[in-house]
Amino acid sequence: MRPCFLRAAAAALSCTLAFTSAAAERPRVGLVLGGGGARGAAHIGLLEVLEELRVPVDCVAGTSMGALVAGAWAAGLSPAQMREQLGHADWADLFSDEPVYGELSFRSKRLSQRFLPGSEAGVHAGGAVTPSGVMSGQKIKLFFNQLVRADTGEPMLEQLPLPVSMIATDIGNGERVVLRDGSLTQAMRASMSVPGLLAPLEYRGHKLVDGGLVDNLPVAEARERCGAEIVIVANVGTPLLPADQVTGLFGISAQVIGLLTEQNVRASLATLQARDIYLRPDLADIGASDFERVAEAADRGRAAAEALRPRLAALAVDAAGYARWQRRIAVRVPDVPRIDEVRVSGLEHVSEEVVRRHLRQRVGAPLERDALEQDVLRIYGDGWYESVDYEVLDDAGRHVLRVMPVEKSW
């Protein structure tokens, strides 16, 4: 028995040393996925090529749409699954906060018949108050929940095996905020909060908007996060418009955001070194809002990666090494939990029973995600809330469904 045990131990030690040696020999690689709205779907094509070539990465940093792709990938979504889910999403509906008419309360139906959509206003302590964005992002946030299976428990950034960083901007002071821990879906939502379009996200004492304003191509964060010796950088930003095409309030606002973004992108590009790999997919005719062209953008990203295939292939490992890396970053998706308790939190003025009357989830039964999301939209349709979200908590071994309505400030 003892000689067999010693031989087995020696073999295991040999494999461990071989893996450690291989990891030590290859350079540490950071992946940088820039922001650009729908153009960011090009990142999917890059991930497909990295997967085919067996190129492992040690961390990923993303901004805006790059944060969405980075987060979904780190949470276990494969490039093929991402192409499928993002390509078939109803983006026009996701970027509309209006619930289906049948999900509106009687009060909200009457208001929708009497007033223009998006014309809400209210009175608060300081006077008249209006929404802080064209949309609250209600449906977008629920979509993020679906992507990363938040119904089985909210993924936390610090718990993901692959280190991931997301960039947001504090709209109060203009500072760059790097999100490395906390709720994955909240970080994705914060990094994508385009000013004026999506309402800022209040999170950890900050009011956060799109990270593209301060760091649309977070090269420095990738180097710092995992000590990357080489960064693979994908820039999908929208080019600036010629001056004669900048017209109207919306056009001027978009150009101002573009100018701020362009300045920080140039600063990031100036730090690239000879060993780094830079991709700029040909997305000239795909706009930041062209979400119906997700598949096409992914194909363009793939083409850009294929053009750099020899350089990317130099970072590849053998099949066994890649399998080890895949196991190391794999995310175990828990089974659908049985709910032991339903909580409603965050209410000050609205009665908790007003929320609970919409909830069909039974205590002791498995969580029914589709029904829950319909119920959440019905709660939102009452018209009293800026947003309504949910999370599944593990409270001393008990699965708690927490529903979190945020009452309107207007």
Where are these regions (language model features)?
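Bacterial N-terminal signal peptides
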Residues: A9-A18
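Patatin-like phospholipase
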Residues: A22-T63, G71-D395, K408
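N-terminal periplasmic accessory domains that precede
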Residues: R398-E407
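Bacterial N-terminal signal peptides that target proteins for export
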Residues: M1-A10
